[in-house]
Curated annotation (Swiss-Prot):
The protein, known as: Kiwellin
GO annotation, cellular component aspect: extracellular region
Alphabetized CDD domains for the sequence: DPBB_kiwellin-like
Homology family: Belongs to the kiwellin family.
Listed Polar residues bias regions: 93-107
Localization annotation: Secreted
UniProt-annotated stretches for the region Disordered: 91-121
Keyword Transmembrane appears in the UniProt entry: no
Organism listed in the record: Actinidia deliciosa
Signal peptide: 1-24
Cysteines engaged in disulfide bonds, as pairs: C28-C60, C32-C44, C38-C49, C72-C90, C80-C172, C119-C144, C166-C172
First-listed, main subcellular location of the protein, grouped into a coarse class: secreted
Length: 213
């Protein structure tokens, strides 16, 4: 019995001596029992080496994809004529110089949008300086009748009135004249808006910035 105990003790000491120094050091998400098992500034959290939230290190999270600008992510998809389009309930935050895409819209009866403008249930003359805003910016109609200031990359600016929503949630139907859902960063302007900015509406889409006037 004494010989067996001596043999087991000898085996245990041999195993310890064979373990190289630092063999237990783990990197991100490696196994650990305490912070001594983790490399550098990492600490042991729930049996895995990870960043120390109190220190604020980002060693393990450094490769995590950054969130989309403005934190606005697609809420779903719609398929129009075999092509999928993202839908949105939100738009990027409005600032004193909000980046956007200017598109052209026909606000007259039978025009691009199908139905009358959301704000007043009326059709409009395209000689008016008017716009439709993406769903998030339209904000349930809270910007109806308000003026926004649009600035083109050529330096020209124009004030235009919000009369409609560029629907980012729905599309591909009769109500939307078969068009896909609007992107979440659209200012859909009348011919008069494009003309005042010195832009060719046939270009289709141009980069602008806008703010509340």
């Amino acid at each position: 019995m004494a010989q067996l105990a001596l043999l087991l003790l000898s085996l245990f000491l041999t195993l310890i001596s064979l373990a190289p120094p630092g063999a237990s050091i783990s990197s991100c998400n490696g196994p650990c029992r305490d912070l001594n098992d983790c490399d550098g500034q990492l600490i042991c959290i729930k049996g895995k080496c990870n960043d120390d939230p109190q220190v604020g290190t980002h060693i393990c999270r450094g490769t995590t994809p950054s969130p989309q600008p403005g934190g606005c992510k697609p809420s779903g998809t719609l398929t129009c004529r075999g092509k999928s389009y993202p839908t949105y309930d939100c738009s990027p935050p409005v600032t004193s110089s909000t980046p956007a895409k200017l598109t052209n819209n026909d606000f007259s009866e039978g025009g691009d949008d199908g139905g009358p403008s959301e704000c007043d249930e009326s059709y409009h003359n395209n000689n008016e300086r008017i716009v439709a805003l993406s769903t998030g910016w339209y904000n349930g109609g809270s910007r109806c009748g308000k003026m926004i200031r649009i600035t083109a990359s050529n330096g020209k600016s124009v004030s235009a009135k919000v009369v409609d929503e560029c629907d980012s949630r729905h599309g591909c139907d009769k109500e939307h004249a078969g068009q896909p859902p609007c992107r979440n960063n659209i200012v859909d302007g009348s011919n008069a808006v494009w003309s005042a900015l010195g832009l060719d509406k046939n270009v289709g889409v141009v980069d602008i910035t806008w703010s509340m006037a």
